Amino acid sequence: MGDQKLTGRVTIPTDIDVVPETLELMKRWGADAIRDCDGTDYPEGLKDVAAKVYSTYYTTRKDNEWAKANPDEIQQCYIMTKFYTAESDKLSIHLMTGIYPEMLKVNSHDDIRRWWEVIDRTTGEVVSCDNWSYSEETGDVTIDPATPFHDYTVSFLAYIMWDPVHMYNAVVNDWKDVEHQITFDVRQPKTHKFSMERLRKFCKANPHVNVIRYTTFFHQFTLVFDELAREKYVDWYGYSASVSPYILDQFEKEVGYKFRPEYIIDQGYFNNQYRIPSKEFKDFQAFQRREVAKLAKEMVDITHEEGKEAMMFLGDHWIGTEPFMDEFKTIGLDAPRHRDAGLCRVKCAEQLQQAPSCGPYPRLRRRRYS
């Protein structure tokens, strides 16, 4: 190929304080695209650059004004307490023990008798709703009567008050005085309408952007932090944060049977990759993939109508958009014409972002996600 200069399939992440370095790296590496990142701003000096401009786009966060005005449509997840052994005929369990308090908030707004579940883990039996109560004041569930020396757990819904990815980035990068981004639910009626209008406004307000880089769509994989802001439980394929009474009501209508929290909780294993999934959990996954793909296609269609390309980041809020499942190809994204090759650019950008410093070119962030 001689001295022919090759370019393409490399995306450079940037920020307002590294414009010269970005241009130099583009030249050295033959990059053909530039993008911003979570926690950065796209530089004015690169808006007319001779490359495609990608914009990270967050469908479920970065608008706390909306989230706070519509608390009933904040995203939710299922949480299970640890196992507690009854030492007498009465047992109290504090729901938020071992969980970072600024990340989650117990959802006692919706019918707790319908959407929570207390289980005697020694026998596997569900404790009757008549035999337990919840105190808003203490945050405790009290089981009365309990069977002495039996183990009990409580499965409950919680609002996601700090987006897990934003929290990770803030903690790892030691961001100071950053408002916690609340995760809102695009699946629900008011937020759905708002989100489609928000996307159109963004496209029109950013004519320099060629590609909307969705990060990702609607539901975060399972990522929960403990009371010290450490990762408590992580499952890149976990569905426990893709739930709400609104979604679960729809699921029940489709499958024709009543939903149980245990379909998600799975004795505390949360249906991780080492478990054999139940029929009910596979039904739930299939339902989620269909609904997520349908809604994602709506956003991709708007992107195309506004004259831009649509690309998906593989990770973060990707639940229901798994590229190895059949529903993915119905979304209509531009990049992934081939399942693997189409996503190479995205992962390459992530790897460059995490690379160690190279001479005068500093690593932009220690960020792992987004």
Residue ranges of predicted features:
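Glycan-processing catalytic domains of CAZymes
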Residues: M1-S370
